Amino acid sequence: MNALLSNPFKERLRKGEVQIGLWLSSTTAYMAEIAATSGYDWLLIDGEHAPNTIQDLYHQLQAVAPYASQPVIRPVEGSKPLIKQVLDIGAQTLLIPMVDTAEQARQVVSATRYPPYGERGVGASVARAARWGRIENYMAQVNDSLCLLVQVESKTALDNLDEILDVEGIDGVFIGPADLSASLGYPDNAGHPEVQRIIETSIRRIRAAGKAAGFLAVAPDMAQQCLAWGANFVAVGVDTMLYSDALDQRLAMFKSGKNGPRIKGSY
């Protein structure tokens, strides 16, 4: 395989190695590059809840490219046209939100593969992913370097988890704590004992099926707990939340009555 198509994040998942990540919601290449120099194993560039355009995602991929931190793109949805765009700008690892059924998972896999294995539109000669046609045999090699992660974040998805795990081409399953707790009747309360029980059971089921298990935990103790349960790609913070907390904490040193750190909640 061409060295430009190597995907260290995927290789480490295959080996079962633990990878610690950070969520990027700030939408700027400048902040993304700062995060990339911090040493996180992976960086989630969020296109679902952060106001990122395709060009914003593109610039952030460029910003982190010189560093060891591996980018993961979360598009706003798993539609075929959007997946085509984020792959063409050079994303190798995708996290697709709100996947509730095995059929949805199969459709997402198909959207990432060129014919005859899928339905990805062909435009490698004008795509950063293929270095504008300079990677020889790009279409024949690229499938091995793509890493596809799906989010399970509803009761329906939990009911279908085993079938989703059976879908060929899915490398990992990410438990979405905020939406999941809301779907289970405990909004903004991923720490509820019943939600915690379901998260633990789900992580163990994912790993038992031979897939990677992921999670976002803004509270350090929750992150440690998920790692203990077997999750092997865990994001331990969100850049905008960390920035906001640092601002509040610094101001509280000089102004009475101001609050200190406020990081809490499911997300």
Swiss-Prot record:
Homohexamer. Catalyzes the reversible retro-aldol cleavage of 2-keto-3-deoxy-L-rhamnonate (KDR) to pyruvate and lactaldehyde. 2-keto-3-deoxy-L-mannonate, 2-keto-3-deoxy-L-lyxonate and 4-hydroxy-2-ketoheptane-1,7-dioate (HKHD) are also reasonably good substrates, although 2-keto-3-deoxy-L-rhamnonate is likely to be the physiological substrate. In vitro, can catalyze the aldolisation reaction between hydroxypyruvate (HPA) or pyruvate (PA) and D-glyceraldehyde (D-GA). It is an enzyme of class 4 (lyase). PANTHER family: 2-KETO-3-DEOXY-L-RHAMNONATE ALDOLASE. The active site is at H49. This is 2-keto-3-deoxy-L-rhamnonate aldolase. Mg(2+) binds at E153, D179. Belongs to the HpcH/HpaI aldolase family. KDR aldolase subfamily. Binds 1 Mg(2+) ion per subunit. Is more efficient when using Ni(2+) ion, although it is not likely to be the physiologically relevant active site metal. SUPFAM superfamilies: Phosphoenolpyruvate/pyruvate domain. Pfam families: HpcH_HpaI. Keywords: Lyase, Magnesium, Metal-binding, Nickel. Its cofactor is Mg(2+); Ni(2+). It comes from the Bacteria. One of its GO terms (biological process) is protein hexamerization. InterPro entries: Aldolase/citrate-lyase_domain, HpcH-HpaI_aldolase, KDR_aldolase, Pyrv/PenolPyrv_kinase-like_dom, Pyrv_kinase-like_dom_sf. The keyword Lyase applies.
